[in-house]
Amino acid sequence: MSIRLDNISKHFGQFQALAPLSLKIEDGEMIGLLGPSGSGKTTLLRIIAGLEGADSGTIHFRNRDVTNVHVRDRRVGFVFQNYALFRHMTVADNVAFGLQVMERAQRPNPAEIQKRVKQLLEIVQLGHLAHRYPEQLSGGQKQRIALARALATQPEVLLLDEPFGALDAKVRKELRRWLRSLHDELGFTSVFVTHDQDEALELSDRVVVMSNGRIEQIDSPVELYAQPNSRFVFDFFGNVNQFAGEWQNGQWVNGSAFIQPPESDATRQSGLLYVRSHELALSDKENSQASLPFEVVSINPVGAEVRVELASVGWQSQELWEAKLSHRSLSEKRLSRGDQVFATPQVGYFFASEGQSSPSVLRWPFLAPGSLMFEI
């Protein structure tokens, strides 16, 4: 079922939780609401559910105006971060609860309820735990039961509030794959809240990035990563290095460091250059188009990559820089703490100091043959 929000706003006293915003969610789409604490994402989810009322605007489920419809009559399933399972009920009774409290005219008979519960427990792969109690389950199992309970009434929309926030990293990853597979199999419309960038990018058809009650960007995970449209989106996604450069004599200068940009009117001014850690090359010497001297601070193998932390030498950077290398490249030419290296951006995203809300994307093919210490 499609969802349309038009000019939704919300205040709590003097605090503006949501500025007027609009959003269209397609039938069968999985949407991630992503943002830091206080961005308004949970408030927006609760307004869609009917757990909060909007101060202004309208909400449509398909062609039905549900702005003033009670949560009970919206046909939504809601999954909470803390599971909200009834401790005194068995797994089967928890799943059946929503069906048992439906109005008499709509309530299935006991045999149908039992059949539906059995089907749902098989879907979430926990049929063998039907007679256990929540305290006997792991966190991942509790979350699956909470999801089965939300699906029991056959909602047209499934809403999830940080569904994996209380789980460890390995279980979170497994449940993300499982939920995406279940969503594709059953075809319901889903909206979930998260502050985890990886979770949003892995699960969502589109990601809605929020900040201070406003929508910063709506895009597919691929487009969002490839073309962030604001400084906030860059900063929030992390793993981004920043070079603050003053425009002098055809290049950006910061202390002893400089970068010469490709010819472009948009970049011939002071501003901030963002460089992702995997789009940064390390060299044993400077070149004519970039000189960013660093000292190696730490070398940290993390899974399939090696993360090298770098401290600026002779110029100012508010934070350490990071470069991501492959294990193969690091084994070919050793790198140690305290080594002096030069970094060169391969791709950069430039924001002018004034009047530019979206970045200019720049690419440099400048390293001379043989000057690379490591290839990313």
UniProtKB/Swiss-Prot annotation:
GO terms for molecular function: ABC-type sulfate transporter activity; ABC-type thiosulfate transporter activity; ATP binding; ATP hydrolysis activity. It holds the Pfam family ABC_tran. Its main location: membrane. One of its GO terms (biological process) is sulfate transmembrane transport. Its EC number is 7.3.2.3. It is found in: Cell inner membrane. Keywords: ATP-binding, Cell inner membrane, Cell membrane, Membrane, Nucleotide-binding, Sulfate transport, Translocase, Transport. It is a peripheral membrane protein. The complex is composed of two ATP-binding proteins (CysA), two transmembrane proteins (CysT and CysW) and a solute-binding protein (CysP). Part of the ABC transporter complex CysAWTP involved in sulfate/thiosulfate import. Responsible for energy coupling to the transport system. NCBIfam families: 3a0106s01 (TIGR00968). Belongs to the ABC transporter superfamily. Sulfate/tungstate importer (TC 3.A.1.6) family. This is Sulfate/thiosulfate import ATP-binding protein CysA. It comes from Vibrio cholerae serotype O1 (strain ATCC 39315 / El Tor Inaba N16961).
